[in-house]
């Protein structure tokens, strides 16, 4: 038995059950992924014990010579990966990364253009329930009703009318390529700073499968998990002239001591992302997303904007008797994990929704490819066509478990 199993069997049991869920169920939440054993090892290391307020070479505590090395490794690898002038790897999350950028540029009451959450944006891009919507004057832009893609003309009109100090670019549920150059042109017409939140697409950007925002934005934020397949955390890139201001807004501005075990895990993930194998992995994510989108469309499902260019898709259930909530719960009972999600111009509440969001990063980490995505489309169709038939859902779950056992990820942790 492990030390944890001996001392705290209750927690050990929960961890084992979650490992089984990740190993045998089909994870299709677009923002989730599975880290490598090397990343897990770094994150579970004794670096968790070390306080290191400040930055490498300028700490407020002694004994930081080891953690200085690991933080510099993370910074240097991120710079190489994305071609950034300056990198801060200390944000605990994507939300805190965004907050630090806002505080570097804005004052309370300043005007910000951000993508409407209901159209695929993120809470921290100006939602009224988030700090960003409470502190700043938010003008939301969104997608065209006809194409369900970003309406750049309307965004420019809003910018010219409201003269924002910052334009926030990026999304949490947008399946198409984002034209960063177009946002830069719009920002330049009104003298706005551009912040790109590429949390969802960072892995694709690193692999050259989505245009990079770095040449077009003063600031680029990201999480280090999702497509980047690192530990849960945040990171900020910026132009050199903003470096000092940005650093001071992370520490001491909004955070105290950085999580050095997480920063070590970030460094490991960035090294993985610099390999040819990582590029092949990202290519497979996109291939799988397109194959799954095609399989769902073939079975009569409607996708917002008609498909996907990246790692995710939104299934529009508004013309069916299903809600996103019902669909999510039925799929969960069949061993398939997705999340209910609003669709553009949704009339249902965020707790019910008219859609589900599906992504392929985690399934691709398991090793699934296009042929399996065709099977997955069939599983989803079988479930959503029989949401009240528990026997059918159980049968699909058996098929899902059999499929996933062919593609082990953490099997050694269950031995």
From Swiss-Prot:
Its EC number is 2.1.2.1. Pathway: One-carbon metabolism; tetrahydrofolate interconversion; Amino-acid biosynthesis; glycine biosynthesis; glycine from L-serine: step 1/1. It comes from Geobacter sp. (strain M21). NCBIfam families: PRK00011.1. GO terms for cellular component: cytosol. HAMAP family: SHMT (MF_00051). This is Serine hydroxymethyltransferase. Its main location: cytoplasm. The modification N6-(pyridoxal phosphate)lysine is found at residue 226. It is found in: Cytoplasm. Disulfide bonds: none annotated. Belongs to the SHMT family. One of its GO terms (biological process) is glycine biosynthetic process from serine. One of its GO terms (molecular function) is pyridoxal phosphate binding. (6S)-5,6,7,8-tetrahydrofolate binds at residues 117, 121-123, 349-351.
């Amino acid at each position: 038995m492990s030390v944890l199993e001996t001392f705290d069997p209750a927690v050990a049991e929960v961890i084992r059950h979650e490992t089984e869920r990740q190993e045998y169920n089909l994870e299709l939440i677009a923002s989730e992924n599975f880290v490598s054993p090397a990343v897990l090892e770094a994150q579970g290391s004794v670096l968790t014990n070390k306080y290191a307020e400040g930055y490498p070479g300028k700490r407020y505590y002694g004994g930081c010579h080891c953690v200085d090395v690991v933080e510099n490794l993370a910074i240097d690898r991120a710079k190489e990966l994305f071609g950034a002038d300056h990198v801060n790897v200390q944000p605990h999350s994507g939300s805190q990364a965004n907050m630090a950028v806002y505080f570097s540029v804005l004052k309370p009451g300043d005007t910000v253009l951000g993508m409407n959450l209901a159209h695929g944006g993120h809470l921290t891009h100006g939602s009224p329930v988030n700090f960003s919507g409470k502190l700043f004057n938010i003008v939301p832009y969104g997608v065209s009703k006809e194409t369900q893609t970003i309406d750049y003309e309307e965004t420019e009109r809003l910018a010219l009318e409201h003269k924002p100090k910052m334009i926030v670019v990026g999304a949490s549920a947008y399946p198409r390529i984002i034209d960063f150059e177009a946002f830069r042109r719009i920002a330049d017409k009104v003298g706005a700073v551009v912040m790109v939140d590429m949390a969802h697409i960072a892995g694709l950007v690193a692999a050259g499968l989505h245009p990079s925002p770095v040449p077009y934005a003063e600031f680029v934020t990201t999480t280090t998990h999702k497509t980047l397949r690192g530990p849960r955390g945040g990171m900020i890139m910026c132009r050199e002239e903003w470096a000092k201001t940005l650093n001071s807004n992370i520490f001491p501005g909004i955070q105290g001591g950085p999580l050095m075990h997480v920063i070590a895990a970030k460094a490991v993930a960035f090294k993985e992302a610099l390999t040819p194998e990582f590029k092949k992995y990202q290519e497979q994510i996109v291939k799988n997303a397109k194959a799954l989108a095609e399989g769902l469309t073939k079975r009569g499902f409607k996708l917002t904007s008609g498909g996907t260019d990246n790692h995710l898709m939104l299934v529009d259930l508004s013309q069916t008797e299903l809600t996103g909530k019902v669909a999510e719960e039925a799929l969960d009972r069949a061993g398939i994990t997705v999340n209910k999600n609003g669709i553009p111009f949704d009339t249902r509440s965020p707790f019910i929704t008219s859609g589900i969001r599906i992504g392929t990063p985690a399934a691709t980490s398991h090793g699934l490819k296009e042929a399996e995505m065709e099977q997955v489309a069939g599983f989803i169709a079988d479930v959503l066509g029989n949401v009240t038939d528990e026997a059918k859902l159980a049968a699909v779950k058996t098929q899902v478990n059999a499929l996933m056992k062919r593609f082990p990820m953490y099997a050694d942790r269950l031995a």
